[in-house]
Amino acid sequence: MADRLRSQAKLEQLQARYVGVGNAFTTKYEWMVNQHRDTLSSVVGHPPLLAYMATALGEPRVQVRKNLLEKMIMPCGPPPPSNQF
């Protein structure tokens, strides 16, 4: 029983620290947005990954970085309509 409570406490601590971990009320759309933003920020934050993408796309690194930062605003498109009235 103590292990279960300890695991639950650790999960709650992770959820408080990292938004992308989600919780029981996280929607699929929110989870996807968090994953996409995390991936995009990782590429922007690691120069070798950014250089690799720039080479693959055939564009300057500055342009690829700008495009990735713009994509972080709405990485998965507009949110789905809510069912709340």
Swiss-Prot record:
Transmembrane segments: none annotated. GO terms for cellular component: cytosol; nucleus; precatalytic spliceosome; U2 snRNP. GO terms for biological process: mRNA cis splicing, via spliceosome; mRNA splicing, via spliceosome. InterPro entries: SF3b5/RDS3-10 (IPR009846), Splicing_factor_3B_subunit_5 (IPR017089). Belongs to the SF3B5 family. This is Uncharacterized protein C211.05. The lineage of its organism: Eukaryota, Fungi, Dikarya, Ascomycota, Taphrinomycotina.
